[in-house]
């Protein structure tokens, strides 16, 4: 009787284990509300991606995420990677404040109250390095040459501090710098064999990288600030290709002036043009980020639109400052020699280049419909007409919110088509720019009241016909306020278009 009872108990336990076992896909745990707490209890360090099956960014991340999971598992690490389909597990998504996809959070020791937001890049090395920084020392102690070689081989970029006295002030400054950098592995050594292997005979810091010149030796007084500046100048390739994976490094970096080479990989002298661009980059490390964009790639077409370029106009070079204004600049010459690109960059840094403002040609029928069509060339004349109250939608053709607004805006135009001093208008801000208005989100709605003082009023009320009418009838008061929707920096990210069924949830970085 006892053995039979034990058998039943064993079968019941096996059934329970089978039901609660954590499913895996490509070494990534698949979590649901029913097993989320179990996963947190089982793993002290858990990185969780909240994703949507339709999300382009999530699809692009998947292979790198799996690669990171496999690498950590192969190393015998305590850290595990997991994923949650937020469209199926809406309670979990709401609990952890998921507003866009992918949202990635790091849970340490089962703490659900304050998980850490993942902030690094989207390549496997970025993920692994960020996690190791969160779970171990800021810098790994390298006791022999094998440990040093292993660290250098482990990532695209590594930094090693060589200090004969690990307790010196310089070593302490190095460790402070290591704590401040999330996405690069650091090592520290006092071992004489490691010094010899890397040709150092005194204290120093070396940045190792698997591209360009291979290594950079720090020179000067070792302080946290100077080390961070040294790393900023040398951690990225001279020329970085814009992709789904590199976008966080490009936008998240400290260098906010970017020069972009739009170059189809199929062009006959591809290597030569890229070589010229790279040669020019050598003189602007830490000042201007040099970015290459494959103009033939489908995912990059929106970036071309943003710069007012067509595929047939490439190769081409443009420069942009990613400050609040997001100002664009165009070279004086179409020649893509290293000398011309270098000259263009120098002229920009010296303040000798005027911003490049795009404009479409003015359509012949621009004023024939209830909603007037504005382009760069007629904007000033129409918007700042002293006798007219002009309400303008600044839109992007691909923007989901703009598409939803379109029929309402058309009705508004119909409502006021015969009004003597109210004009309803629209402007495609991906193809037209004006000095008087800087558009930072889509759609942006601005009111230009009839006056001589060039007043501009932002609209941020309800996007309904009644809301717009109240705003206009109140002279631009009822509904006035700052506008904040789809940020233009997101417009530069690949695969950002929203599907109708996405409920306007942004596919965020």
UniProtKB/Swiss-Prot annotation:
InterPro entries: PDI_thioredoxin-like_dom, Prot_disulphide_isomerase, Thioredoxin-like_sf, Thioredoxin_CS, Thioredoxin_domain. The modification N6-succinyllysine is found at residues 224, 273. The modification N6-acetyllysine is found at residue 202. The modification Phosphoserine is found at residues 333, 359, 429. It is a peripheral membrane protein. Phosphorylation of Ser-359 by FAM20C is induced by endoplasmic reticulum stress and results in a functional switch from oxidoreductase to molecular chaperone. It also promotes interaction with ERN1. It is an enzyme of class 5 (isomerase). One of its GO terms (cellular component) is endoplasmic reticulum. One of its GO terms (biological process) is endoplasmic reticulum to Golgi vesicle-mediated transport. The record marks 463 as: Lowers pKa of C-terminal Cys of second active site. Keywords: Acetylation, Cell membrane, Chaperone, Disulfide bond, Endoplasmic reticulum, Isomerase, Membrane, Phosphoprotein, Redox-active center, Repeat, Signal. The record marks 122 as: Lowers pKa of C-terminal Cys of first active site. It catalyses: Catalyzes the rearrangement of -S-S- bonds in proteins. PANTHER family: PROTEIN DISULFIDE ISOMERASE, PROTEIN DISULFIDE-ISOMERASE. Belongs to the protein disulfide isomerase family. Heterodimer; heterodimerizes with the protein microsomal triglyceride transfer MTTP. Homodimer. Monomers and homotetramers may also occur. Interacts with P4HA2, forming a heterotetramer consisting of 2 alpha subunits (P4HA2) and 2 beta (P4HB), where P4HB plays the role of a structural subunit; this tetramer catalyzes the formation of 4-hydroxyproline in collagen. Also constitutes the structural subunit of the microsomal triacylglycerol transfer protein MTTP in mammalian cells. Stabilizes both enzymes and retain them in the ER without contributing to the catalytic activity. Binds UBQLN1. This is Protein disulfide-isomerase. It comes from Rattus norvegicus (Rat). The gene is P4hb.
């Amino acid at each position: 009787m006892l053995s039979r009872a034990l058998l039943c108990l064993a079968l019941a336990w096996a059934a329970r284990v089978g039901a609660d076992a954590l499913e895996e896909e490509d070494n990534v745990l698949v979590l649901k509300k029913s097993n989320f707490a179990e996963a947190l209890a089982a793993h002290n360090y858990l990185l969780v991606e909240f994703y949507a099956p339709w999300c382009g960014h999530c699809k692009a991340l998947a292979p790198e995420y799996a690669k990171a999971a496999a690498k950590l598992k192969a190393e015998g690490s305590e850290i595990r990677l997991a994923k949650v389909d937020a469209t199926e597990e809406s309670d979990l998504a709401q609990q952890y404040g998921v507003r866009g996809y992918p949202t990635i959070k790091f849970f340490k020791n089962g703490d659900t109250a304050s998980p850490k937001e993942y902030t690094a890049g989207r390549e496997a090395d970025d993920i692994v390095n960020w996690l190791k920084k969160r779970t171990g020392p800021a810098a790994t102690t390298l006791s022999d040459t094998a440990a040093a070689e292993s660290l250098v081989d482990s990532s695209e970029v590594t930094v090693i501090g060589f200090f004969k006295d690990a307790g010196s002030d310089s070593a302490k400054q190095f460790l402070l710098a290591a704590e401040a950098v999330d996405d690069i592995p650091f090592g520290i050594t006092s071992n004489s064999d490691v010094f010899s292997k890397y040709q150092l005979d005194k204290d120093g810091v070396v940045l190792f990288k698997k591209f360009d010149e291979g290594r950079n030796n720090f020179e000067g007084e070792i302080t946290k600030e100077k080390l961070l500046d040294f790393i900023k100048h040398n951690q990225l390739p001279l020329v970085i290709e814009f992709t789904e994976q590199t976008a966080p490094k490009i936008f998240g970096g400290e260098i906010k002036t970017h020069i972009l080479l739009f170059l189809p990989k199929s062009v006959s002298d591809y290597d030569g043009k890229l070589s010229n661009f790279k040669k020019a980059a050598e003189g602007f490390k830490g000042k201007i980020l040099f970015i290459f964009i494959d103009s033939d790639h489908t995912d990059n077409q929106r970036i071309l639109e943003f710069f007012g370029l067509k595929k047939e106009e490439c190769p081409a070079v443009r420069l942009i400052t990613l400050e609040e204004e997001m100002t664009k600049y165009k070279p004086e010459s179409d020649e893509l020699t290293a000398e011309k690109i270098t000259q263009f960059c120098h002229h920009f840094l010296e303040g000798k280049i005027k911003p490049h403002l795009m404009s479409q040609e003015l359509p012949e029928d621009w004023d024939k419909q209830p909603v007037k069509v504005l382009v760069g060339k007629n904007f000033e004349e129409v918007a700042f007409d002293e006798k007219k109250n002009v309400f303008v939608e600044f839109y992007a053709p691909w923007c989901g919110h703009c598409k939803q607004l379109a029929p309402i805006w058309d009705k508004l135009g119909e409502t006021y088509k015969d009004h003597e001093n109210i004009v309803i208008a629209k402007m495609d801000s991906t193809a037209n720019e004006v000095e008087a208005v800087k558009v930072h989100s889509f759609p942006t709605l601005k009111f230009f009241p009839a006056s001589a003082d060039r007043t501009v009023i932002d609209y941020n009320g309800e996007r309904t016909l009644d809301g717009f009418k109240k705003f206009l009838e109140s002279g631009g008061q009822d509904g006035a306020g700052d506008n904040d929707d789809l940020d233009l920096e997101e417009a530069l990210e690949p695969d950002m278009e929203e599907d109708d069924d996405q409920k306007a949830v942004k596919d965020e970085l």
